[in-house]
């Protein structure tokens, strides 16, 4: 079974332009993410999936320099980009680690791989419930990737709203009746602040990440992050104010998807 990690990344983010090349501990985010994911044993390749747009030339130039595998494809439809990349690399199962999910843990990547290998799922994603998808839980959706069977992408490509094919693609799998899906439920026994955001969407997230990585360096788990936050409560103030902004943007994108 050919299992590859796909990292969707593009430089034209409106909230934090060129975020994948922003540096943390003097290492660009995309390179730091790849370094962390190299600890996963059960994957063939780690592939950055970017677009054919000229605005992503700089990213591709960097990937070539660092000898990181990449694929350039459709700039308006991420699922088509995934499908085309899968055809090129003969991928059967995609482990979807978004380029701004820098905190994704190799341990949970391996868990998702195991679930996909041992069950007949088309799609699996981390969640805090077995029934209702909750994308606002930024602990789970910051450290746990999604698993996608390539053959299932064909089933959902026609369901995507023509006006917006870059966001809300996971929700298509979640909401489709033709998809065999599963929620990987993770309930931490540790206290998790509701305002914790383990992603890089806004400048405040970048500032927060720089603080975390300056303390913990490259290899750490969510438990280490929670301990740092408990010992340094002021760190959360950097990201508390943007949660409402994120939720507003998410809801607007879902309305258009």
Predicted regions and their residues:
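Conserved beta-strand segments of alpha/beta enzyme cores
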Residues: 45, 69, 180-182
């Amino acid at each position: 079974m050919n299992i590859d990690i796909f990292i969707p990344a593009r430089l034209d983010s409106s909230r934090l332009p060129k975020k994948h090349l922003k540096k943390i501990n003097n290492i660009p985010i995309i390179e730091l993410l790849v370094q962390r994911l190299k600890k996963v044993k059960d994957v063939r390749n780690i592939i950055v999936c970017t677009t054919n747009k000229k605005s992503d030339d700089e990213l591709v130039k960097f990937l070539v320099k660092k000898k990181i595998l990449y694929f350039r494809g459709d700039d308006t439809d991420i699922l088509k980009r995934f499908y085309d990349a899968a055809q090129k690399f003969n991928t059967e199962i995609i482990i979807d680690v978004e380029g701004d999910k820098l905190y994704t843990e190799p341990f949970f990547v391996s868990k998702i791989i195991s679930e996909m290998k041992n069950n007949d799922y088309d799609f699996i994603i981390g969640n805090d419930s077995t029934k209702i998808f909750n994308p606002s839980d930024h602990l789970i959706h910051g450290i746990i990737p999604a698993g996608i069977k390539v053959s299932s992408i064909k089933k959902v490509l026609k369901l995507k709203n023509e006006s917006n094919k870059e966001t809300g693609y996971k929700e298509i799998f979640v909401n489709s009746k033709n998809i065999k899906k599963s929620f990987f439920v993770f309930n931490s026994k540790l206290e998790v602040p509701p305002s914790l955001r383990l992603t890089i969407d806004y400048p405040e997230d970048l500032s927060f990440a720089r603080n975390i990585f300056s303390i913990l360096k490259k290899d750490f788990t969510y438990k280490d992050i929670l301990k740092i936050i408990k010992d340094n409560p002021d760190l959360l103030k950097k990201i508390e104010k943007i949660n409402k902004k994120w939720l507003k943007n998410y809801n607007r994108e879902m309305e258009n998807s």
